[in-house]
Amino acid sequence: MASKERRYPEGKKLVSEQSDLNPTVSIIVPVKNGAATVQELLESLMQIDYDKNKLEVIVVDGNSTDDTQEIVSKFPVGLLKEERPGLNAARNTGINHSKGEIIAFTDCDCVVPRNWIKRLTEDFRNPQVGCVGGNILGYYDNFLSRYSDESILPVMRIFKKRKVLSSVKPPLQYPAGCNMAARREAIEDVGGYNENLMYGFDEDELVERICKKDYSMVLDPKVVVKHKHRLTLLELLKQNFQYGRGGGLLSKLEGTNSTFSRWILLCVSCFFLLCSAIAVLIFLIISAGSFISSVVLSAILLLPPIGLMVFYLRQTFNENNRGYKKVIVYPFIDIIRSIAFVSGAAYQLLRSVAKTEKVTQSGNSEI
C-alpha cells in the first residue's frame, strides 16, 4: 500500500529553470482494469523519440482484478500499486516516486505519437509556463468517435490554435488529464491533485490552482494523443453523467471559490430555468386557441435544435463533407449529452446536501 501521506522524495532538487532544452520527464499512467488497452499505450510509449536517459514511465495500478499488472510487468517501466481509491491517489503516488523536471500524464486508453514528449517540452522552454495541454483525437474511425471530435462541445479537448493563458476558461479552454504535463515545482507549489475529487474535473481543478500561483498555461494543438472514445451512445452518456458528478462534487467542495464550480452552478441553474421555460411553452402550445399561435410557439421551442443543425450544416459545407447524417443526429446527441451532464451535477449536489443534512441530524441527536 502506498503511503497516505503526500510526500516528495528527499533530496530532490527543484528547478526554476530547466537545465537544458531537453529536461528530464516522468510519464505517469494511472490504471485500473486496463488490460484491454494498456499494452497498446505502453508500446507507443516505448517508441517515443526522446533521450531515454531523461525519460521514465511510471504506471500506477489501482487494485486491478484483470491482467493489467501482468501486462505492464513485461515492459521496462516502473509499476506501483495503489490501494487507495481514485485516479488522484494514483497520480499523486506516481508523482511522489518520479524524478522528472516535467511530469506528463496520459491514460491507459490512449496511444501517443513518437513526438509527444518533444512537443510538450518545447512549450516549457519559457520558465513561466506551469502546465501544457494538447488535443485528444479519436482513435477509432466510426460515427460516434467522429462525433466526439466534431461536436460543438467536443468530448475531449480540441484546440484550433496555440494559446498562452493566465487562467482557465470554461467550458473548453483548459487541458484534459490524458494529454497534459506540468512543471514539477508548479505541482509541488499547489500540493498535487486533490484526492477528495472524483468522477471528473480533478485535473481541471489542479490546473486552476497552478494558474493562481502566477504560472501560465499553454494550450497547443500540435501536442496530440489518440483516445479510444466511447463506442456506444449509452457509454458516452454515462461518461457525461460522471463528468457532471465530478463538477457537482467540486462545487460542493469549493463553493464559489473555483471558476469551474461557478460555471457548474451556472449550468445547473440555467438548465432548470430552461426546463421551466420549455414547460411553459408546451402548456401555451396545448392551450393556444389558434393554429398560428401554436406554430409560433412551436418554432420558439425548436430554436435550439434548429440552431445546432445550422451549425453542423455549415461545418459540413466548409469541410466539403457529404456526411449530412450528422446534421440531424449530432444536435440530438448534443442535447442528451448536456442533459446527462447537468443531471449528473444536480444529482451529486443533491446527494451532497442530503449527506450533510444526515450528518447534521446525527450530530444533533447525540447532543
Predicted regions and their residues:
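Short, acidic, metal-binding catalytic loop of nucleotide-sugar glycosyltransferases
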Residues: 43-54
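Catalytic donor/gating beta->alpha subdomain of glycosyltransferases that bind UDP-sugars
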Residues: 133, 138-140, 194, 198-199, ...
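Short, flexible, basic/aromatic active-site loop/helix in glycosyltransferases
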Residues: 134-135, 140, 151-172
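A recurrent flexible, glycine/aromatic-enriched loop bordering the glycosyltransferase active site
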Residues: 162-181, 198-199, 225
